[in-house]
Regions:
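Short active-site loop/helix that positions an aromatic residue
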Residues: 76-87, 101-103, 236-244, 366-380, ...
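Active-site-proximal helix-loop-helix substrate-binding element of RNase H-like nuclease domains
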Residues: 32-39, 43-57, 63-166, 173, ...
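Conserved "right-hand" nucleotidyltransferase catalytic core of DNA-directed polymerases
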Residues: 1-15, 21, 29-38, 107, ...
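Amphipathic, charged-and-aliphatic alpha-helical interface segments
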Residues: 407-426
């Protein structure tokens, strides 16, 4: 099988770039234009080609893609351009960006420039900055040639990086990278836009029903005016003050200054949802119900993606996107956490359709983090509880409350569940207190009580604590 290392250079501008748009939006845009492409077949000299779309397509057609692996740095981008714009689909996909995340971690810096510097394999140029806002007709012949040298250098750096990273990289992981990229580049799922349009209409109707009841009280003429007043932090704070309530404040993580604590997970806002004045409770409920929700944004995104891709739904997942090695969401969507319990919100998941003669199997690993942790640490009592099918959450909750807890005690069991899933990974008292208070169904415990619970967990799960210490020593 041949190895083809490739890098596309494409038009971008202030309002049209991968920082403004998702990868899918950028490539599907009418503004999309290839300036040129650098290609290296095996160990042959790297070539640069620039021309019209038809010219580039003819140039790419000379390669035997059916017996070639494609190598890029961010193959999700270049591979999608090949497939969507030039109908080229190689036999196998390789990606040094994915490989670097697995080798160096998600926070190590995965840009080609940083990795080239790390391995001392050469320097990445800066010509791409000078190309901003230039379409192919805007380049002089000398500028285009210089841009070509920049692109060819990127191709050479990518191959050198691959040769280093692949020396001990398992084939099984390369197969996972290939599979992950194919889910995006060569999508097979279809989207049921009719189901999504219906659910989107229901959401909007529900929101306007909420808004209609507040028009007179807030002295607004339209539902849209109510929505804007409640959605704006500044205007919502003003409404609270007009009704004798001081808006809750917090320290901004970005500026360090005081700002309104009106996000749905802010403790100050959560306290307002149970305010003694029912009208304040209603204001908070309507604010939560009328602000653009994750569900609404996702539905609109699914519909627009499907429309641009002839009903198909590319699945963008980031290989080794989390510290644990798990996949992460990408392109402003995460297909790993689509709602599954709420019947109405399940529209998102139900709208993902299998192609003809196939079915979708919906599955999930139950309590996987807690199970693997107990097994890895050798916490045999907890492993045995899982093996027996015991309710591990209720068992620990029973220790906390010193009485038998079952599923008939939803709040207490919620506390036990939160502890089992969080305390095993180092959660402390303050974090536990915040999580219990802000996550539904919610439990308001003092910091001192949370400290007692943390100590109880660590005293009764000594093998897990030892695993932490052993891990620290190895690091």
């Amino acid at each position: 099988m041949n190895l083809i290392t490739l890098d596309f250079e494409t038009y971008y501008a202030q309002d049209y770039s991968l920082t403004k748009l998702t990868t899918e939006e950028y490539i599907r845009s009418k503004k999309f234009e290839v300036i040129g492409v650098g290609v290296k077949l095996n160990d042959e000299p790297t070539t640069w080609y620039s021309g019209s779309h038809a010219d580039v397509k003819r140039y790419l057609a000379q390669y035997d893609w059916a017996d070639s692996a494609l190598l890029c740095h961010n193959t999700m981008f270049d591979g999608a351009i090949l497939a969507w714009r030039f109908d080229v689909r190689p036999k196998f996909y390789l990606d040094t960006l994915c490989m670097a995340r697995a080798v160096h971690g998600v926070d190590a810096g995965g840009s080609l420039a940083k990795l080239a510097e790390r391995y001392d394999i050469g320097a990445k140029g800066t010509e791409v900055v000078e190309a901003k806002g230039k379409q192919i007709t805007g380049f002089t012949s000398s500028e285009l040639a210089q841009y070509g040298e920049y692109c060819k250098n990127d191709v050479e750096l990518t191959l050198k990086l691959f040769q280093i990273l692949s020396s001990e990289f398992p084939q099984e992981e390369l197969d996972l990278i290939d599979m992950t990229l194919r889910m995006f580049i060569n999508p097979v799922f279809n989207v049921d836009d009719g189901l999504l349009e219906s659910r989107l209409e229901d959401i909007k109707n529900e929101k306007y029903e909420l808004l209609g009841g507040l028009k007179e009280k807030l002295k607004c003429e339209t539902e849209e005016e109510v929505r804007k007043k409640l959605a704006s932090n500044k205007q919502f704070a003003q409404v609270l003050e007009e009704h004798g309530v001081k808006p809750p404040m917090k320290e901004s993580k970005t500026t360090g200054k005081q700002t309104f604590a009106l996000a749905k997970n802010d403790e100050g806002f959560i306290a307002l949802t149970s305010h003694e004045d029912p009208f304040i409770q209603q204001l908070c409920a309507v604010r939560l119900g009328t602000k653009s929700t994750i569900e609404e944004s996702r539905i609109e995104r699914f519909i627009s993606v499907g429309a641009r891709n002839k009903g198909r739904l590319p699945i963008p997942l980031k290989y080794y996107g989390a510290h644990t090695g798990r996949w992460a969401g990408s392109d402003k969507v995460n297909f790993q956490n689509l709602p599954s319990r709420d019947k109405k919100k399940k529209a998102l998941k139900n709208a993902v359709l299998a192609p003809d003669d196939h079915i979708v199997i919906n599955c999930d690993s139950s309590q996987i983090e807690a199970r693997v942790l107990a097994w890895l640490a050798g916490q045999s009592d907890v492993v045995e509880q899982f093996a027996n099918g015991d309710d591990v959450y209720s068992i620990f909750a029973s220790k906390i409350y010193e009485r038998e807890i079952s599923k008939k005690d939803p709040i207490e069991r919620f506390v036990g569940k939160t502890c089992i899933l969080g305390l095993g990974y180092g959660t402390g008292a303050l974090k536990l207190q915040h999580t219990l208070k802000t996550q539904p169904p919610g439990a308001d415990l003092t910091e001192e009580r949370c400290k007692e619970i943390v100590d109880l967990y660590r005293d009764t799960n000594d093998k897990i604590i030892k695993l932490w210490k052993d891990g620290d020593k190895l690091l």
